[in-house]
């Protein structure tokens, strides 16, 4: 990867989720939301899912869960071999103080990803695209610069944002709303939360060097819900 970053500088601004699965907990539950995401990605048009939910409900975990499904080969043929690249918007904006500098950098990233083929771009807190890179004098922001790639179909996008930021920023960009399919990510219920934590129990026991007694997780989840 380091050699690739030297020859392909656009890789400095993205993280390939497929290559970073080992450091993340597996996605447990959320089958309905993940299936809906896959269905949208397989469409011919409006094939860019937008995960909208409160902070902490697991929107980013869904992107990693999809990457894991792709690596396991458990996806439709249209998604087989796809790579999910998370765009680092903060790094992308850093040091771009001159007009045209941001546009040039973003275009280089998108062209690099397009040439890779079978690419999906994941943008966490996608509402930050609106206004990003705009320097005045009629210059475009990132959301406008991405529209040709959103329309072209060669690159698919997954975005995530909160309801508050969606209503405040994203919903006002008609072009983005038209190109993304909203998928609501609700907070899991008590039963689903217990199922999720039970699935992660062994990892936490190993990390903390403890053994959780039977019933402790159900009690903790129920008490937290209250």
Predicted regions: what is each one?
Residues 2-21:
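Conserved ASCE P-loop NTPase core motifs with emphasis on AAA+ ATPases
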Residues 5-10, 25-37:
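N-terminal pre-P-loop "Q-motif" helix
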Residues 32, 43-65:
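Walker A/P-loop nucleotide-binding motif
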Residues 41-43, 107-111, 123-156, 162-175:
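Conserved catalytic/switch belt of AAA+ P-loop NTPases
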Residues 47, 83-84, 114-121, 152-159, ...:
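Loop/turn-to-beta-strand initiation segments
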Residues 67-80, 92-93:
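Post-Walker A helix-loop "phosphate-sensing" segment adjacent to the P-loop in P-loop NTPases
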Residues 76-77, 120, 167-175, 182-226:
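Conserved C-terminal "switch" segment of AAA+ ATPases
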Residues 85-114:
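Short glycine-rich substrate-engagement loop in P-loop NTPases that contacts/grips substrate
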């Amino acid at each position: 990867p380091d050699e690739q970053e030297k020859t392909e500088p656009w890789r400095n601004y993205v993280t390939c989720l497929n290559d970073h699965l080992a450091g993340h907990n597996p996605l447990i539950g959320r089958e309905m939301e993940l299936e809906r995401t896959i269905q949208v990605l397989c469409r011919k048009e409006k094939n860019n899912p937008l995960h909208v939910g409160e902070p902490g409900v697991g929107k980013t975990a869904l992107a990693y869960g999809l990457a894991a499904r792709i690596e396991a080969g458990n996806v439709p043929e249209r998604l087989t071999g796809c790579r999910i690249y998370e765009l680092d918007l903060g790094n992308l904006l850093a040091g771009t103080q001159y007009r045209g500098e941001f546009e040039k950098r973003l275009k280089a990233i998108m062209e690099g990803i397009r040439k890779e083929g079978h690419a999906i771009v994941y943008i966490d807190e996608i509402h930050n695209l609106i206004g990003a890179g705009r320097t005045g004098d009629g210059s475009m922001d990132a959301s406008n610069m991405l529209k040709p790639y959103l329309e072209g179909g060669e690159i698919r996008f997954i975005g995530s944002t909160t309801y508050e930021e969606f209503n405040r920023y994203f919903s006002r960009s008609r072009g983005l709303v038209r190109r993304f399919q909203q998928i609501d990510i609700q907070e899991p219920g008590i039963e689903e939360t217990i199922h999720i934590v039970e699935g992660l129990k062994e990892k936490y026991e190993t990390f903390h060097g403890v053994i959780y007694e039977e019933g402790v997780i159900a009690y903790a989840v129920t008490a937290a819900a209250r």
